[in-house]
């Protein structure tokens, strides 16, 4: 019998090869007493990595202590607008792009190590990440992925004995983040504001060839590409609003050119339905409040369009940007109709949606729980599983009567509709208090709560009785937590 050949990831680092001057080469700086705490088995399988990659001595890769053949570590430079103000040069201040893995299906995946030490772009930072923020990003990116929302992924969490000084002393940690690209709106802004139009075009050509090859050579390739960026961003905002996700720090340097969620910091999911929910305690003006996210995304796209103004006419830019609102409204409308159990469109659908949301605001009802219970409605029953959640029974009964009447227009039976609604209304979301409980135990080297929460979040739409406690309403102290940007 022939010995089993060990699989080794293959790296083809086009960013390093084609974009000289867009980065600085450097090596990760290891942490003291680093050790692998946890990893995502489903993602590992997608990347072709079996269990032995997460045992000694292979774990040295996840801790920045060793490189795999073909890796070319570098820190990317970019700039951006932060809280609406031009912030100048930023860049990878604590992250290092290790390399671009070529998968068997032809896709490429960046391996990006967060918390890897000082870079030329660290500014006043120490280049490190703390265990708290690494666990939050791991859980959030995996949660959004399994909710069907485009996002970066997280493969490994490394903890250490390395002290990191924030508001208090915390454990240093590293996260191996995976995404098809880490290019941000801010990459284009950087070279635009440095008056380097050739570099803006070089970057645009690289991105198009890498991710939109069908438009290479087209006479309107830049407009077609930018239009798709606009529409992808619009659809991403629809996803966020539909599941009740607040990102918290939508600076242009945190906006992906591929329209994926990335750079998880002070994020939060809605508990009670509060449209103006602010999850970032540094956001004193509410710029990045939950209900303002679609408007901020469009503002950010205008900043990107400005940086691309040397590649397109003003009319082409405007035409692309005008695609945003229709794409947003179509995606949001489809997703919210699915949450309500409507397969067909009807003129009263919007009134029913706004009526339910208004009741939720008035009575402080939980966003996720309300829609999940709505999935259990039986169209021919006057009894609603939601009724006991509302104090103003008369107002709810009036809404529910109109809702049942609307459901009776649908062509599918209760069982089919309930299943389709459950597939649109998650039972399990990453509430901040659950993340905090997992963090508290992980800091004591107990990963059981982390493992359990991660497992539940991998099937957010499926009833899992063993995880019913993770679907419970949050305690009063756990509602609407505001999170610090410090990480």
Curated annotation (Swiss-Prot):
Family note: Belongs to the SELO family.
Cofactor: Mg(2+); Mn(2+)
Keywords associated with the record: ATP-binding, Magnesium, Manganese, Metal-binding, Nucleotide-binding, Nucleotidyltransferase, Transferase
Amino-acid positions noted as binding ATP in the UniProt annotation, renumbered to this chain: 91, 93-94, 114, 126-127, 177, 184, 263
Cross-referenced PANTHER family: PROTEIN ADENYLYLTRANSFERASE SELO, MITOCHONDRIAL
Full protein name: Protein nucleotidyltransferase YdiU
NCBIfam families associated with the record: PRK00029.1
Function comment: Nucleotidyltransferase involved in the post-translational modification of proteins. It can catalyze the addition of adenosine monophosphate (AMP) or uridine monophosphate (UMP) to a protein, resulting in modifications known as AMPylation and UMPylation.
Gene behind this protein: ydiU
EC number annotated for this UniProt entry: 2.7.7.-, 2.7.7.108
InterPro entries hit by this protein: SelO
Pfam families according to UniProt: SelO (PF02696)
GO molecular function, one term: ATP binding
Broad EC category: transferase
Residues the entry annotates as binding Mg(2+): 254, 263
Active site, per annotation: 253
Keyword field contains Manganese: yes
Catalytic activity as recorded in UniProt: L-seryl-[protein] + ATP = 3-O-(5'-adenylyl)-L-seryl-[protein] + diphosphate; L-threonyl-[protein] + ATP = 3-O-(5'-adenylyl)-L-threonyl-[protein] + diphosphate; L-tyrosyl-[protein] + ATP = O-(5'-adenylyl)-L-tyrosyl-[protein] + diphosphate; L-histidyl-[protein] + UTP = N(tele)-(5'-uridylyl)-L-histidyl-[protein] + diphosphate
């Amino acid at each position: 019998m022939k010995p089993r050949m060990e699989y080794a990831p293959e790296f083809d680092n086009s960013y390093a090869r084609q974009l000289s001057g867009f980065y600085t080469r450097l090596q990760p700086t290891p942490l003291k007493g680093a050790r692998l705490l946890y990893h995502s088995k489903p993602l590992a399988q997608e990347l072709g990595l079996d269990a032995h990659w997460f045992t000694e001595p292979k774990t040295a890769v996840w801790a920045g202590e060793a490189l795999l053949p073909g890796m070319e570590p570098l820190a990317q430079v970019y700039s951006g607008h932060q809280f609406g103000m031009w912030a100048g040069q930023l860049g990878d201040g604590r992250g290092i792009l290790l390399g671009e893995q070529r998968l068997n299906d032809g896709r490429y995946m960046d391996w990006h190590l967060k918390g890897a030490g000082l870079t030329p772009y660290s500014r006043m930072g120490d280049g490190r990440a703390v265990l708290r923020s690494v666990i939050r990003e791991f859980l959030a990116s995996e949660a959004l992925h399994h909710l069907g929302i485009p996002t970066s992924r997280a493969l490994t969490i490394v903890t250490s004995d390395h002290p990191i000084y924030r508001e208090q002393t915390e454990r240093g940690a590293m996260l191996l983040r995976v995404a098809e690209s880490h290019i941000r709106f801010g990459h284009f802004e950087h070279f635009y504001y440095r008056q380097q139009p050739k570099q803006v075009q070089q970057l645009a050509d690289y991105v198009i060839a890498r991710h939109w090859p069908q438009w290479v050579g087209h006479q309107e390739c830049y407009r077609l590409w930018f239009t798709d960026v606009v529409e992808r961003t619009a659809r991403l905002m629809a996803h966020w609003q539909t599941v009740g996700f607040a990102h918290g720090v939508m600076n242009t340097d945190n906006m992906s050119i591929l329209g994926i969620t990335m750079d998880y910091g002070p994020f939060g999911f809605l508990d009670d339905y509060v449209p103006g929910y602010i999850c970032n305690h540094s956001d004193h003006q509410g710029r990045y409040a939950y209900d303002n996210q679609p408007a901020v995304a469009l503002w950010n796209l205008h900043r990107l369009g400005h940086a691309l103004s040397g590649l397109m006419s003003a009319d082409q830019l405007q035409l692309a940007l005008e695609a945003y609102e229709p794409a947003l409204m179509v995606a949001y409308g489809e997703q919210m109709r699915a949450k309500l159990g409507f397969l067909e469109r009807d003129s009263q659908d919007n009134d029913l949606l706004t009526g339910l949301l208004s009741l939720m605001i008035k009575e402080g009802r939980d966003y996720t729980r309300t829609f999940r219970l709505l999935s259990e409605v039986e169209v021919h029953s006057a009894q609603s599983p939601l009724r006991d959640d509302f104090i103003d029974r008369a107002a709810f009964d009036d809404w529910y009567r109109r809702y049942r009447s609307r459901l009776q227009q649908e062509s599918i039976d209760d069982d089919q509709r309930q299943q389709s609604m459950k597939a649109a209304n998650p039972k399990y979301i990453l509430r901040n208090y659950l993340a905090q409980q997992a963090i508290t135990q992980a800091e004591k080297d107990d990963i059981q709560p982390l493992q359990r929460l991660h497992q539940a979040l991998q099937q957010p739409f499926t009833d899992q009785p063993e995880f019913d406690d993770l679907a419970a309403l949050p305690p009063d102290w756990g509602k609407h937590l505001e999170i610090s940007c410090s990480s």
